[in-house]
Amino acid sequence: MQHISSLARKLGEPSKSVDMTQGGICRTILAFALPIMIGNLFQQLYNMVDTAVVGRGVGPEALAAVGAASPVTQLLLGLLIGMTSGMSVVIARYFGAGDEARMKRAIATGALLIGAIGIAVTVAGALLCRALFEFIHTPEDILDGAVEYAAILFLGAVATAAYNYEANVMRAFGNSAVPLLFLIVASLLNVGLDLLFVFPLGWGVAGAAIATVLSQLISAILCLAYMARRVPQVRLARSDWKWDGALAAEHLRTGVPMAFFSSLLAISFLILQSALNSLGSADVAAYTAASKMDTLVYQVMAAFGTAVSTFAAQNYGSGSIGRIREGVRRCTGITVAVCAGLTAFAQLFGRFFMLLFVGPEDAGILASGMMYMRTTSVLYVVLGFNYVIRFALIGVGKSAIPMLVGLSEIATRAAVTYLLVYRIGFAGMAFASPACWVTSTILCGLCYAPMMRSAEDRLRAAPAASAWPGFREVIALWKGWSL
């Protein structure tokens, strides 16, 4: 632990806080995004290790149970990650504008707000968990396992909320390396606890869930201890802890759309999961394994999205709209290249990826999973463009548009589910995500230019820190694309 603290101190020196309003754009974005990307992948490692351990150590039914629980648990994680990411945009904006007093009040108010949200999520999850799984027609042979796994994760929601808020506060200052370090430590601990609880102790899916919660809690404690000693921006006075309704509203204006966006996958996948459950536990297992590749791509793109939103927020605070536009162009090129590489990996090595979760004797599950992976991976490039544009709009305060686009994703996935999955079976699952990516990316592309012009006009009219637009801009956009 002493070595970890020493390394954290080195990573957290003031030079590690990134001022994204100056310097090379690509270098700045990549330096900021890479630690977040690795962190996102390690965060996803929690669920992937749970899935792999129960799949290979317990059996296909346990794999299907964790898979059936995945949309519900991802809804929890997406809500908390999105909300805390949105709060970090507010903090980054005041950091970029040099308003230290308001920045500290924003940190304190955000902590109170996310704590209340974490408690509410825990209570709601504990009360509604079984009813939700029954509502989406979870097969009887995996129902108890899915409920048990999800309920334990809901009980650990406060720890998850605490870690993600602490990490995103540091990221708002440009320090993404220290949160990554603590997340890696906790992820490796999760691997060890998973192996211990599932194999020697035989706790099954419950053991995998308990390992995840304990690991998240340790990650939160490590991060908080480091911040208390080494991050001067969070040394708050008692007066900073006074509830500020205006700042809470700002947090919600950015946090709710990002939470909604981060939860969209889970919300729309709940619709898809209901149809998938009707196909039986074998198809649930195939989808659970194959869709992990999609999830990894989402996490990589989310890292670029977080970097772009922070880049846009800091530069909006300093009045540099031109730099934001150039950053979006360059980041788009980077994500296209990265997504092309991920597509090649899925096409060439998909079978080896599937074998992490199921044995070679499960030939039917392997075949279905490979068909799914080879179909969806073709359009990963579209997904990358989508994330860059959407998060750039959030970074400059145009959060209503991403929410509108998110609703289109839910509608598209629901349509594909009822038009294809219920008619042609598992093959229809492979078209649901690509259809969402295409429709939402078209909408993002249409909205980007007028929304950036609106941000520039608002910047000229008033200080950037004073105004965040609302849904009236959506109406104005519909009336004539005149913003």
What are these regions (language model features)?
Residues L41, L45-A64, F133-E140, L196-W203, ...:
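Helix-terminus/linker motif at the lipid-water interface of multi-pass membrane proteins
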